[in-house]
Regions:
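Asp-based, Mg2+/Mn2+-dependent phosphohydrolase catalytic module
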Residues: 2-35, 41-46, 51-71, 75-233
């Protein structure tokens, strides 16, 4: 397959790793692509800057030679936040580990009542499995925009399913709120990865983001069936 394409846009979580360890077969495939002078871009819906994801991959013992091109939804959102596109003051809905996405504007962080918009990077606690708390939390704030830095609904950390920011975003929309998404499957982030005319293929495990995103850009895709949808097959 690889001889037909110039550029490979590859998802990370569910393809390269499972949140706990690397997929050795996937690393071998990436190594072969690079040896054949193919352009490899890791495109992730991680709600953190690309540099933070690189650190995480280093902790999983992924070699730096593979990590030259990483783009995250958090990185794209961070650029927009610094331009104050949605107002100045924000409320952060998500775990503390995602604070790096707003590090440069951290002085503008405030509470729900005073904020101009809601910055959603996920649930407060990875282990939560009930979204009713968030429905109560947000019910009086649907007049504000919610910025979703990870459109994924769920992810598997090892064998454990966890909610992502996308699940809160969908809940917020169902309550009548407006959501602005950064990341896959939306076209803007793909335009940062390749130019028109490049023979490009996307590889991912999420039908709603990876494969839909490829379809939105009219590029080919490879679906990894033993990732986030594995229980459905």
């Amino acid at each position: 397959i690889y001889t037909s394409y110039d550029t490979f846009i590859i998802d990370l979580w569910g393809v390269i790793h499972n949140g706990i360890k690397l997929n050795s077969k996937a690393i071998e495939a990436v190594d072969n692509l690079m040896k054949n002078k193919k352009k490899v871009i890791f495109l992730s819906n991680a709600p953190r800057p690309s540099s933070e994801v690189k650190k995480f991959l280093n902790e999983l013992k992924m070699d730096n030679q593979y990590l030259k091109n990483i783009l995250t939804s958090g990185e794209a959102a961070m650029q927009a936040l610094q331009e104050k596109k949605y107002g100045k003051f924000f409320f952060h809905l998500g775990p503390k580990r995602d604070d790096s996405v707003f590090f440069k504007i951290k002085e503008n962080k405030t509470n729900l009542e005073k904020c101009n918009f809601i910055l959603c990077t996920g649930l407060f606690d990875d282990g939560e499995d009930d979204l009713n708390y968030y429905k109560e939390l947000l019910k009086n704030h649907t007049d504000k925009k919610l910025i979703c830095t990870n459109p994924d609904l769920t992810v598997h950390r090892g064998d454990v399913k966890e909610y992502c920011a996308g699940s809160i975003a969908k809940l917020f929309e169902s309550m009548g709120g407006e959501v602005i998404y950064f990341g896959k499957p939306y076209k803007e982030i793909y335009k940062m990865c390749f130019r028109s005319g490049e023979k490009t293929i996307a590889i991912g495990d999420n039908l709603n983001t990876d494969i839909r995103g490829a379809n939105n850009m009219y590029i080919d895709s490879i679906f990894i069936s033993n990732g986030v949808h594995r229980a459905e097959f």
